[in-house]
Amino acid sequence: THYFSSTKSEKIALFNNVARTADESCIIFTTYHSLRRVVDAGIDIDVAYFDEAHNACTKQFFVPVAACSNFADRSFFFTATPRQSRRHDRGMNNTTVFGNVICNVPAPELINNGSIIPPVVVGIETNADRTKDSAAQIDADTVSNIIDNLDDNQAAKVLVAAPSSRVLGRMLGQSDMIQQLKDRDYHVLHITSKFGAYVDDRKVNREEFFNTLTAWGSDPSKKFVVFHYSILSEGINVPGLTHCILLRNLNVVEMAQTIGRVIRIDRNDAADIASGKLTPGQCQFYRKSCGFVSVPVHNNYGAATIKRLQNVVDAIFVKGIPPLALV
């Protein structure tokens, strides 16, 4: 980032003290990984906001989150996928750390008031047998085939959840998938903790990657496919994403978070709802009426994934049940 940044506690404390001495507000953004550095800085915190707060329930992050919640004057936790525990104190049902639930909005209400759009699960049947040795080639062919069946009249912006960094690396480097996508006028982006971030053939830093993703997501004429293993599934707000392809089975939280990437309402639809041109909840009249989640079903793989996915979608978006998970 081009803003001042540091993960050294003494520099964080110095930055905060300078701002306070100048009677200026001090806003600190941190990842959960670096939160302990802020805690170690020993600064006074008026308000702490924890986004994607289900991450706070992991062994790695719970202690600094609990410490921050304890000494901050006020703390607020936001998540679409709460985690609870019956065996230890790391669950979000620990009111000492996470407080009481002050707002819980069911997904059907969000659809009806024009905040999100509904997801549609699409099973893509193939005649292939997916094995460890053939996984990369089968998955590469599957992505190309799904892309071929998308609507030519609307520029598609596709998120692909890869089975692993290893398989993704082989899909990108040992098949002709990238060329196949280029021949179809699609840009290709991919990001993993192992290989870093790429825009087409160019390696970029994370800031440029996400800025490009946001800009292209807002451009109606841009067609792109973005591949990831796990780094994108949470907290990435790209309203333009229209399709998601699940190449691997996910747990409930990961499924719900991945679905959430493609059900953001189109910005022009949001503007028309605000002006009264569109009625909230009448999604059939939106430019982007739903978010598609495609799951390949091979001869020996995929049937269980699509069944679990449909159950998760029905529970969240039809019955209004939050996707609770145990930690």
Task: Briefly describe each language-model feature range.
Residues 1-39:
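Inter-Walker segment of RecA-like/P-loop motor cores
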Residues 23-65, 228-230:
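Conserved RecA-like ASCE ATPase "motif II neighborhood" in helicase/translocase motors
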Residues 28-31, 73-80, 225-228:
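Structural recognition of the conserved hydrophobic beta-strand(s) that form the central parallel beta-sheet
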Residues 55, 195-324:
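Conserved RecA-like P-loop NTPase helicase motor core
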Residues 55-116:
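Post-DEXD/H (motif II) to motif III coupling segment of the RecA-like Helicase ATP-binding lobe
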Residues 100-169, 173:
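Conserved interdomain linker/interface between the two RecA-like ATPase lobes of SF2 helicase motors
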Residues 141-149, 155-159, 164-167, 300-327:
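Long, largely alpha-helical accessory region at the distal end of helicase-like NTP-driven motors
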Residues 165-192:
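Conserved helicase motor "Helicase C" RecA-like lobe of SF1/SF2 P-loop NTPases
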